[in-house]
Amino acid sequence: MMKRVLLIFVSFIILGLEADNHEENSSGCDALNPVLGKTTVSIEHEGKNRSYRLYVPKNYKSDVPTPLIINFHGTGSNAEQQAIYSDMDSVADKKGFIHVNPQGLELDGRPVFNAGLTMQSPANKRDFSKAPRDDVDFAKTIVEDVSTKYCLNKKKVYSTGMSNGGRMSYRIGCEAADTFAAIAPVAGVLSLPPEKCQPTKAVPSIAFHGTWDLVSSYKKAGGFSTMGAVQMFSLWAKKNQCKGKPIVTFQGDKVSCESYLSCAEGAEIKFCTIDRGGHCWPGRLGFGSCRLGASSNINGSEMIVDFLLQFERS
């Protein structure tokens, strides 16, 4: 009799664990005839028409919970340009994740995301009161929209982006740790006042920054940055309750990475320096100063994806 009671009890525990795991997979796991490849999706958010570019990899299966990476463009750019510049679609096919590029709304004639810079910011003046938008909530709305159409592993949702998109990723880390498991800012630092950034959970990160970046400064506040990238590395480590000193975790030609490994909830905070790198996506030569500054010796997009996919939201 005791054995039977014990078996029933264990069965309830197992069923409960399976139910908990199932809750993290989206309703889109039941969707029929999913559209693969590239599409543009329009949604309404805060009474405005918004859109995002969606890429579903060739190997997508509707019964397999799939990670999602949201990849934000920089100021003056757009969703399609960011997809091409980062070459994330091809990485999605290799690594098996859904790739989304949100489209920013215009402010003063240029598409931009509200990463937190305001008229009061010391390094830049952006008056979002002229065109208000909550882009953190927009990102969360995108996650929910995708999750109704595709089979998402909702524990494996991530944010990356270039410049303003990198700053947006930091804001997401501050305000949406309940949705996003990790972030990968490129050439951007936190725009919010540090005291207003209070993540509810540890948020692992990998960040890339060039030492010759004149838009988002490497060593000190300047350009569009309220602080230098090196200072941001230390700040994010503190926000994630990291202990000790960073150690070198990658050394390549003109590219090196340091990591804090003893952080809350097993998070890793990683910072990659591109020697004489400009305001560029790592590994993508691009145009202008990026022909000289970007390192073609690494595939930054693959490094980002490999890092992000290690982590699940707790």
Predicted regions and their residues:
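A domain-start/cap signature at the N-terminus of enzymes
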Residues: 17-68, 80-86, 94, 131-137, ...
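Alpha/beta-hydrolase
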Residues: 70-72, 186, 274
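The conserved beta1-alpha1 loop
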Residues: 70-74, 209-210
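Active-site glycine-rich loops that stabilize anionic/oxyanionic intermediates
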Residues: 73-77, 277
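Cap/lid segment of the alpha/beta-hydrolase catalytic domain
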Residues: 103-133
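Alpha/beta-hydrolase active-site loop
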Residues: 123-150, 171
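The feature captures the conserved acid-bearing segment of alpha/beta-hydrolase catalytic domains
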Residues: 181-265
